[in-house]
Amino acid sequence: MFCDLHTHSTFSDGTFSPTEIVLKAKEIGLDAVALCDHNTVAGLDEFVLAGKKYGVTTVAGIEFSTEYNSKQLHIVGLFIKKENYSDITEIMAESQKLKEESNKLLVKNLAKDGYILDYDEIKNSTVDGFVNRANIAAALMHKGYVSSVKEAFQTLLMSKFGYYVPPKRPSSLYIIERLKGFGSISVLAHPFLNMNEDELREFLPKAKACGLNATE
């Protein structure tokens, strides 16, 4: 069985719509595909409907931006039930508010050094009105300040450059516990992105006790 259990759509930082992801999965012969947009379930209804329409097994998911010991960790939730969409939206509401404040501060800090961006213009260009750093990276590229989105992330949008101040995020362990309560599967995504081996060994037993099911 061939599956892709971690994709993103245009509802976060992907380049395909939820329907296009389903069509691509069908084209390349996947047996199942999961949509795990960052901090939103906004694309899941379209995704699941497209799966039924085109005969592709879909897995409703989400990727939460969380925090543990001041490090950002991404927790993927799989097999999200529609009945829990409102709970997840409520969990993310405060996080989205803090994220928007962080994004506005980023644009303001960039402007101080001559990187002029229009935040409202960026926001209006998104599918659901939620801005992430990928949107800001694209705006920097379109303005000619960087040659690519990748360059933006490797330079101006890195915390060490001083423009980006990360927002406060929900606890990793709290999100894992909530996913367990929903009857969903929780997965630690790309574990070595922000943790070394010792930190991972310290985190995993606690995460498992809270209900963590897997790592990527």
Regions found by a protein language model. Give the residues of each.
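An N-terminally biased module of ancient metal coordination in phosphate/nucleic-acid-related enzymes
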Residues: 1-72, 155-162, 170-216
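Active-site phosphate-binding and catalytic loops of NTP-dependent enzymes
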Residues: 166
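Active-site gating loops and adjacent loop-to-helix segments of metal-dependent hydrolytic enzymes
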Residues: 67-94, 98, 119, 138, ...
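Glycine-rich, often acidic, oxyanion-interacting loops/wings at catalytic, nucleic-acid
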Residues: 131-136
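Short coil/loop linkers at secondary-structure junctions
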Residues: 31, 116-118, 146, 213
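N-terminal helical cap/lid subdomain that shapes the substrate entry/recognition surface
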Residues: 126-130
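Conserved phosphoryl-transfer catalytic core
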Residues: 97-123
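Amphipathic alpha-helical segments that form well-ordered structural scaffolds
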Residues: 105-112, 139, 174, 178
